Amino acid sequence: MTSPNGVFSHLTYFMAAGALSLGIGFFALASALWFLICKRRELFEESKFKEFGENMKQGSCKPKLKAHPQCVFISRNFHAGYLQSQTEKREKEEAEKKAVRSHSKVEFCLQDPISCESPEVTSVANGSSVSTLSLSTSISSSYCCQTVEEAEDWLTDDCLETRIPLKNPLLGEPLKKKVLAYLSSISLEEWPGNTVSNTFCSEQKTDSLKELLVLKNTEVGKHNLQFDIE
């Protein structure tokens, strides 16, 4: 007779062996299913590539490619109303800005009539400025001619002496020295352009002296009043 402990031990062994065999079987089934799924995907992708290549060869993919720009065109037409409203708003804003600017220019011209003179007046002013410039240039040129004539008169004696022995080039050096000495002796105060500045400076000096005299007289008067009060 077998003991119950031996029976239980045999049952446990059989159960463990059955569990192992079931686990191995499930693992084998799962691996087989995974392999089949991967193979199916590969076959499906290969069939897709083949169909695409055949369609490319036959030219059946051209209408598919033309469908995309049609969609873009539809979307542009869909948003055209929004874009038109934006453009209209911008045009209105620009028109308002132009009107405000023109109104401000008119007001400025009314406030400052001198700045908004006619082109004829501006041309007359330009002509007067040109005439003053021409007068100043003529005055300066006449003054230069006078100085040159004076230099020629001053050097007539030396020129008469040096006309005969012109063959010797060294005789021209003293003439150059004399000319340079004469030009250096001319003071800048004789220039007509400086007369205005000199007169202006003299007027400023006289005004300052007058102010000093007035201040001194007032101080003396105050001092005399204080002395009389004491």
Curated annotation (Swiss-Prot):
Instruction: Give the originating organism.
Output: Mus musculus (Mouse)
Keywords, A to Z, come to: Glycoprotein, Membrane, Transmembrane, Transmembrane helix
Q: What topology does it adopt in the membrane? A: Single-pass membrane protein
Q: What is the lineage of its organism?
A: Eukaryota, Metazoa, Chordata, Craniata, Vertebrata
Organism's domain of life? Eukaryota
Localization in the cell: Membrane
InterPro entries from the UniProt entry: DUF4718
Ranges annotated as spanning the membrane: 17-37
Task: Give the sugar-modified residues.
Answer: 126
Where is it found, in Gene Ontology cellular component terms?
membrane
Pfam families hit by this protein? DUF4718 (PF15842)
Q: What is this protein called?
A: Uncharacterized protein C1orf185 homolog
